[in-house]
Curated annotation (Swiss-Prot):
Subunit and partners: Homodimer.
Native organism: Corynebacterium diphtheriae (strain ATCC 700971 / NCTC 13129 / Biotype gravis)
Extent of the signal sequence: none
PANTHER family given in the database record: DEHYDRODOLICHYL DIPHOSPHATE SYNTHASE COMPLEX SUBUNIT DHDDS, DEHYDRODOLICHYL DIPHOSPHATE SYNTHASE FAMILY MEMBER
Keyword Membrane appears in the UniProt entry: no
Keyword annotations from UniProtKB, A to Z: Magnesium, Metal-binding, Transferase
Enzyme active site: D43, N92 (proton acceptor)
Protein EC: 2.5.1.-
Lineage: Bacteria, Bacillati, Actinomycetota, Actinomycetes, Mycobacteriales
Pfam family, one: Prenyltransf
Protein name, entry field: Isoprenyl transferase 1
Record-level Gene Ontology MF annotations: ditrans,polycis-polyprenyl diphosphate synthase [(2E,6E)-farnesyl diphosphate specific] activity; magnesium ion binding; Z-farnesyl diphosphate synthase activity
Cofactor(s), names only, from the UniProt record: Mg(2+)
Family recorded in the similarity comment: Belongs to the UPP synthase family.
Length: 265
């Protein structure tokens, strides 16, 4: 009984202090350098569900899905112009069929929410959509196309995405384009460069991420934006994605503002 009372008081104190901490963080990032492009690795959904005591770990994916719309709104409120959200890797496609179907349904709901008029996002799907079931691919593409005239935050949705595969696809597309133009093999080799490959990435025409955030305590990129994140600042947090809060995001922005970006120099 004492433990319960102690926890309850602590919880009340935390809830009372939270708004003040959030306001303090907002003050600390006012007028300082902020990222234009933030990339998010939404990791830890299943672990969060297990540790929270849910028998059905898919509950973690559902709670995590609701967090994505919140995250996009946080970005809009802090003048982040572009967000890339990593939802499904090519490796994830090897999971059990029942779990995959559940993930496809959740991702479809997330994309539909982001495509809603209220959100006003401009969506871009990045990844191998041809690896997805036809109905899933159609649903995502229709949602993407419906946002063409929106004026809000740009949101890249990485689905069926693999960083190595993206680079391979970019090089192949470059070679195909040059071959179609009658370029010889020798001329083609001379035209392959960082800039020419960048123009054929899934994210072509967009700035590279300034800040990559990964939740759940894992400290690796796991194939996410391997080319684009070469000089990104990376911020890791032990917090699982479903438990990720606005103060966590603001802490990441504060940390970013304190770092000196050298771009390999």
């Amino acid at each position: 009984m004492r433990t319960l009372k102690k926890f309850s008081l602590r919880d009340l104190a935390y809830n009372a202090a939270y708004p003040f901490y959030e306001k303090r963080l907002m003050r600390e990032i006012q007028g300082v350098r902020q990222p234009e492009h933030v990339a998010i690795m939404c990791d830890g959904n299943r672990r969060w569900a297990r540790e929270a005591g849910f028998a059905d770990v898919t509950h973690g994916h559902r709670v995590g899905a609701k967090k994505i719309g919140e995250m996009v709104r946080w970005c809009a409120h802090t003048d982040v112009e572009l967000v890339t959200v990593y939802l499904l890797s090519t490796e994830n496609l090897g999971r059990a069929s029942d779990e995959l179907q559940m993930l496809f349904d959740i991702i479809g709901d997330v994309v539909d929410e982001l495509a809603s008029p209220e959100t006003n996002c401009r969506l871009r799907l990045v990844g191998h959509l041809d690896l997805l079931p036809d109905d899933v691919s159609r649903r995502l593409t229709q949602a993407q196309d419906s946002t063409n005239d929106n004026t809000g935050v740009f949101v890249n949705v990485a689905v069926g995405y693999g960083g190595r595969q993206e680079i391979v696809d970019a090089v192949r597309e470059l070679i195909d384009a040059e071959a179609a133009a009658g370029t010889t093999a020798t001329e083609m080799a001379e035209k392959i460069s960082v800039d020419s490959i960048s123009k054929h990435l899934y994210t072509s025409g967009q700035p590279d991420p300034d800040l990559v955030i990964r939740t759940s305590g894992e400290q690796r990129l796991s194939g996410f934006l391997l080319w684009q994140a070469a000089y990104s600042e990376i911020w890791f947090t032990d917090t699982y994605w479903p438990a990720f809060r606005r103060v966590d995001f603001l802490r990441a922005l504060r940390e970013y503002s304190k770092r000196s970006r050298r771009f390999g120099k």
